[in-house]
């Protein structure tokens, strides 16, 4: 790869230090695990270049960009608990499926240029005529800025609190 080519380059002057981050899509993972090991101790680091696979580029093509490029990634997990039962008995139920659907809709509305929130997993159980007691949601939140990340997390908490108050779930 690139490291091998640079190491073999006779005109290259300097020290090249290659880092490979483990579990970059996991939490905790990626750079936080690497940096916890203090890999730069004893080195005078003048530049760090990050690389990530970009499926929109042709194989063998490198893309460069100054500044922020890859966002932070938070894994989100939610549980909506209600009182399930037979679908014909809706007035007696506290439907977590309906509440979860509204919650997902409100979460997705938080998306904008500096934030990407996705729900990639919804698990409920039940049957065609049975409303489950609980719905599980999982997704990711990606932001470029720590302050923006904190703001979105607070908005998520506010939405959850408001829905809890409105639905009794």
Which functions belong to the PLM regions below?
Residues 1-3:
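DPxDG-like acidic metal-binding loop motif
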Residues 6-121, 126-130:
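Histidine/acidic-residue-rich, glycine-tolerant segments that coordinate divalent metal ions
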Residues 97-169:
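Metal-dependent amide/peptide-bond hydrolase catalytic core
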């Amino acid at each position: 790869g690139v490291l091998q080519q640079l190491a073999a380059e006779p005109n290259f002057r300097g020290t090249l230090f290659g880092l490979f981050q483990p579990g970059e899509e996991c939490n905790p993972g990626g750079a936080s695990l690497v940096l916890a090991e203090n890999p730069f101790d004893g080195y005078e680091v003048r530049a760090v270049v990050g690389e990530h696979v970009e499926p929109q580029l042709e194989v063998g093509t490198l893309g460069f960009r100054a500044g922020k490029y890859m966002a932070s990634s938070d894994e989100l997990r939610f549980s909506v608990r209600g009182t399930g039962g037979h679908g014909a008995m809706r007035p007696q139920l506290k439907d977590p499926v309906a509440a979860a659907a509204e919650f997902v809709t409100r979460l997705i509305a938080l998306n904008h240029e500096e934030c990407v929130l996705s729900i990639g997993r919804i698990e409920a159980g039940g049957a065609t005529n049975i409303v489950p007691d609980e719905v599980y949601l999982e997704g990711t939140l990606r932001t470029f800025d720590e302050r923006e990340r904190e703001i979105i997390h607070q908005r998520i908490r506010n939405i959850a609190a408001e829905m809890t108050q409105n639905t009794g779930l």
